[in-house]
Regions:
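Glycine-rich dinucleotide-binding loop and its adjacent helix/turn
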Residues: 85-88, 153-221, 227, 323-333, ...
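Active-site substrate-recognition segment that forms the wall
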Residues: 198-238, 252, 346-370, 374-389
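N-terminal Rossmann-like FAD-binding beta1-loop-alpha1 element of flavoenzymes
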Residues: 7-34, 201, 208-218
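C-terminal, flexible cofactor-proximal segment of oxidoreductases
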Residues: 270, 306, 321-497
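Glycine-rich active-site loop/strand segments that organize a redox cofactor
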Residues: 40-91, 182-188, 227-248, 357
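Short hydrophobic core segments
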Residues: 12, 35, 146-158, 202, ...
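A Rossmann-like FAD-binding core segment of flavoenzymes
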Residues: 114, 216-320, 387, 393-405
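Feature captures the FAD/FMN-dependent oxidoreductase FAD-binding
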Residues: 75-150, 155-159, 268, 275-286, ...
């Protein structure tokens, strides 16, 4: 008979949030394992190691992790300087992974393929909560099954496809050799692929901004380099940030992009909902309905992220049907409702799944399809959860978080989603009709309830489900990049998974 309380806590993913979770577990003296699919820590962060983060070091460090590192002689970086993704790994994540209380618990090339309850499928409810978790893992020596008293899924998110309907556009899979998802290093390791090429960037978030500016720089150095940009919205009004942003690097990024647009360094295509790609003798042609964009050689897909829920299919999760975040968290982060202020601090109580106690999705993945995740938010999540697992409910319920006053949206404007000046006259009729349609909020039918119809002064969002709150404008296209990421595969600004 397995005694569940003697089993380790399993953390899935050795990115920033997974490693900080390990630090808290170590500090609390709880046994744990960290299972990482890649050959090293922070596999996803390494994909954007060239990118400078929007947040200075003092936003990017966790106090408990810092305490563990300091005890080993670690010296903190300048708190006001801005690290690149590579520096974030080298100065913080790698030393943390080498800590003697953490290193023995790391398992690399251990890809988790399924999580469930030992001896119980999804339909089996008898004594479910009393059973340990069974974690199926593909290892270098074959498939294994590990048992755990609790599981923290910090495995991050996966890129959205180009297709405007939520699935890959027709022809997208056939063109994958010419598509990069996230934020390629066009001035460094990926330069040869983009030099002298015609490139289309799809998406309107900060990762798209960074790639566009790098391509503009490349075009100054490499003749024949042409930069195209496709966005869903018909207007960029209010989309390029504010110099009043408490994260000034984020505000400056949008201002630099505005200058590049004014100088005609970028060919902007508005109102593009990608539905088809076709490879021709002139290049790849992207279609939005009957509209065809000019042929290009390469495409950068910066259309946001979503959680990979496949490995969780045998768990009884209470997820919002739209945002795909825990039901107690979803209303606070849903871009259809969330204005551009800060997300309320949250921890174990908001992240608990009532029918699967001691299972938690944390980090970027916990936000589902919402784009406003910050590293600090993830650190607070795992601090609260680990305190609860240790039985310290006073600490678990205590709020220990400060976010930028300008919020995760990055602008000085803080008002209800979709103010009148955010929507063109042409969009108004469609938008108003959409706004009064009720939306189903909660995952399971036993907890189903309808969200009240959105009553917003002025025209509402121009798309049936706006998918982000960013840059002082909550009403944004789904084809946008997260404000920041560390665990996801895009440009890492201040967040992680």
């Amino acid at each position: 008979m397995v005694v569940r309380e003697t089993l380790p806590v399993v953390v899935v993913g050795a990115g920033p949030i997974g490693l900080v979770a390990a630090a808290h577990l170590a500090q609390r003296g709880l046994p744990f394992l960290v299972l990482e699919a890649g050959p090293d820590i922070a596999t996803s962060v390494r994909r954007w190691s060239h990118v400078r983060m929007f947040s200075p070091w003092h936003f990017d460090l966790d106090p408990v992790a810092v305490s563990l590192l300091t005890s080993e002689g670690w010296s903190s970086p300048d708190p006001e300087s801005y690290p690149t993704g590579g520096e974030f790994i080298a100065r913080f994540l790698e030393p943390l992974a080498r800590h003697p209380l953490i290193r023995p618990a790391l398992r690399f090339s251990h890809r988790v393929t399924a999580i469930g309850r030992l001896g119980r499928d999804k339909l089996s409810g008898h004594d479910r909560a009393g059973r340990p978790f069974a974690v199926r893992v593909m290892t270098p020596t074959g498939e294994q099954e590990l048992l755990a008293r609790a599981v923290l899924d910090a495995s991050g998110a996966i890129p959205n496809p180009l297709g405007g309907s939520g699935w890959p556009a027709i022809g997208e899979r056939a063109c994958t050799d010419s598509i990069d998802y996230g934020m390629p290093d066009v001035l460094g390791r990926d330069r040869a692929r983009y030099a002298g090429a015609r490139t289309l960037v799809v998406g309107a978030g900060h990762s798209a901004f960074g790639t566009l500016l790098d391509l503009v720089s490349l075009a100054e150095q490499e003749p024949g380099t042409v930069v195209h940009w496709a966005i869903r919205r018909r207007s960029l009004a209010g989309r390029l940030g504010s110099l009043q942003d408490e994260l000034p690097e984020r505000g400056r990024l949008g201002q630099r992009l505005a200058r590049a647009l004014e100088a005609d360094r970028i060919v902007l295509h508005r109102g593009i909902l990608v539905d088809r790609l076709e490879r021709t003798s002139q290049g790849i042609v992207v279609f939005a309905g009957e509209r065809a964009l000019p042929p290009v050689d390469r495409i950068v897909c910066a259309t946001g992220y979503r959680p990979d829920l496949e490995l969780l299919r045998e768990l009884r999760l209470a997820l919002d049907t739209v945002v795909e975040a825990p039901v107690a968290l979803a209303p606070a982060i849903d871009p259809a409702l969330h204005s551009c202020g800060t997300v309320p601090p949250h921890g174990v109580e908001e992240l608990t799944h009532p029918q699967e106690p001691d299972f938690f999705v944390v980090g970027h993945k916990s936000y589902g399809r919402a784009p406003t995740f910050l590293l600090r938010t993830g650190y607070e999540q795992v601090r609260s959860i680990v305190a609860a697992l240790a039985g310290d409910w006073e600490a678990a319920r205590r709020v220990e978080l400060r976010l930028p006053a300008t919020g995760v949206c990055g602008g000085e404007k803080i008002e209800a989603c979709c103010s009148e000046r955010d929507v063109t006259e042409k969009e108004t009729d469609q938008s108003t009709a959409v706004a009064k349609r009720p939306l189903l909020l909660v995952g399971g039918p036993e907890r189903a309830r309808l969200r009240p119809a959105l009553e917003i002064a002025g025209p509402a969002c121009p798309w049936p489900r706006p998918a982000r709150a960013e840059q002082g404008v909550c009403c944004a296209d789904r084809a946008d990049e997260p404000v920041c990421t560390c665990e996801s595969e895009s440009a890492g600004q201040t967040c992680g998974g």
